[in-house]
Amino acid sequence: MEESDTTKYVIHAHISAEGVVERPDVVGAVFGQTEGLLGADLDLRELQKTGRIGRIEVNITSKYGKSNGNILIPSSLDKVETSILAAALETIDRVGPCISKITVTKIEDVRSSKRKQIIDRAKHILTDMFDNSVPESQEITDAVKAAVRVEEVTFIDNLPAGPNVLDSDAILVVEGRADVLNLLKYGIKNAIAVEGTNVPQLVAELSKKKTVTVFTDGDRGGELILKELLQVADVDYVARAPDGKGVEELTQKEVVKSLRSKVPVEQVIEVPQGRRRNKLAAQAAEKQAQAEAAQKAEAPAAAAPVQPQREYQQKEYPQRESRERSEQPRGEVPRRKSLRRTEEQQERPERPERSERAERREYRERREYREPREPREQREQAPARKEREPSEFDEMMKELSGTLSARLLDANKNVINTVAVRDLANTLKESNGDVKSVVFDGVITQRMLDIAAEKNLETLVGVKMGSVVKQPAGVKVITTE
């Protein structure tokens, strides 16, 4: 059967005739008896001329004076028009001189057959062609990536670095060349390696001009490098790999997570050696003052209950002696008197118990009456532990507690902006002078005080004071501790 390229459906019909008929007779009956039946738009001759239907295929055989066969008509019409043509075939009742009957058996969707063929072929292509080529392509891709990474590594004063270290406004300081290569693999091109704990002078000079983030390994070596960098370089942020892992071992997801979790250098516990000595000395002096104040406060409290306790013991002992003396017989007495005496001895202990309870109650009342005076004496002897006066920023500090955020206020205490603590220093440096007060959930450091004085801030409110060597006179500092 010949079909056009646009064939959508094939009409299958069965024909039976009471006599001997041949193929030309059937084709002539199909065209002749349907002509003018469905109108000009569905005329079979016109549809065949325009290619809307294909060549009519007839297979018929004759036996014992009767003929039977099949008719196939390919169609590129839609479902509705194809169904109308199929129904029109069943109206044919004569083929030549013989009575005949045509019955439509099915309408085949050619596109479904093509879909099945496409699926089978796609399975074959997928299993036989792609399996052998994927490993080879992967090897080629890995080789190209490795070559590009090696070519991108540059050396600045013999230090491995990415190609954008000198041009970028911010740099990452890592430990070794493997760390730089791993970061280049994920598109980070502004990393430079220090190659050990001896920090080169180049890194110290770059830290003065650029925003520096130290990205250390999650081991002891990373801590040592961080301490060294804090002493000789101007570090802005600190990022750390997960515990037990090096930067060269991290996946892209771990690298991004570690860099997003970076913290300002002010939040890092370790500080340069000179500041550390001052901080330790201040902490030792504070602890000594607190210990002396606590001893002075505890001295009156410890001495107060001693005297009532001795009085209570002195009062208790004569009662016990009197009871013991009353229980000792002075001589022989009649039996009735001894019985009375034993009854009295059984009844007498109740009175001393009541007197003891009364004395204990009186002693507790005296202690409760005297204890409220102790905090006053303690405040008089240790004025350093006086409670902090309430501030107009207390409510705002409660709102910021635990958020690691900061609020910038104008002269009227209105909130201008809210930023993260790690971005506070850069935000203040870029401010235009309208910020007069800063309230943040963090530690007040020397660097923060210097920036506040430079920007003419009036008030700086934080959680506590850090290692501050010099406090500007024009900046009022308030802490919640």
Curated annotation (Swiss-Prot):
It is an enzyme of class 2 (transferase). Residues 312-393 have a biased composition (Basic and acidic residues). Mg(2+) 1 binds at residues 175, 217. Its EC number is 2.7.7.101. GO terms for molecular function: DNA-directed RNA polymerase activity; metal ion binding; poly(A) binding. SMART domains: TOPRIM (SM00493). Its cofactor is Mg(2+). The keyword DNA damage does not apply. Residues 281-309 have a biased composition (Low complexity). It catalyses: ssDNA + n NTP = ssDNA/pppN(pN)n-1 hybrid + (n-1) diphosphate. GO terms for biological process: DNA replication, synthesis of primer. GO terms for cellular component: cytoplasm; DNA-directed RNA polymerase complex; exosome (RNase complex); primosome complex. Keywords: DNA replication, DNA-directed RNA polymerase, Exosome, Magnesium, Metal-binding, Nucleotidyltransferase, Primosome, Transcription, Transferase. Mg(2+) 2 binds at residues 217, 219. Residues 169-243 form the Toprim domain. InterPro entries: DnaG_primase, Primase_DnaG_arc, TOPRIM_DnaG/twinkle, TOPRIM_dom. Forms a ternary complex with MCM helicase and DNA. Component of the archaeal exosome complex. Belongs to the archaeal DnaG primase family. NCBIfam families: PRK04031.1-1. This is DNA primase DnaG.
